[in-house]
Amino acid sequence: MKRFSLVAVAGAVALLAPLGAAASAQAAASVPFTINEQITLGPDGQPVLQTFTATRPLCPEGTYVDTVQATQPARAQGPDHSGQFTLIVRSVYTCDGGRGTFNALKELIGTFSGPDTVTATGPIQLLGGTGAFTDLRGHGVDTGSIDFAAGTATGTDTGFIVRS
């Protein structure tokens, strides 16, 4: 009886071993990414040009559009007593060269760091797109700053693509 049990266990381990290797291969498939964003602001403080560069497997460069979907506190109320505010931002990145677009969702905590400057940080999720990026999935951190006096803003998104 013990002999049969040992043989059965050994057989089960042999059958399940490839599943462990497959899980390890999937975990090893996550790839780091960096997106560097540059924004030129108009006289009203709104973006007039938004460009980016990125590391592989994303496209090397392109343009993007941010849409603010929610703010807390509400825009009319301004920042809360701590000087902070939260933005939920949907970004659509369009690759130069026609490789497609990819989408991101960001939850940014902004802080006024001077009379004309804001710094922000928060999580970013990469959520599919078109063309080469249909199955794109990833996560990371967005950090950035706005200098209204200079009319510029920059951002850096870093993280891992877990499926593409």
Predicted regions and their residues:
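Beta-strand-enriched cores of mature, soluble protein domains
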Residues: 26-164
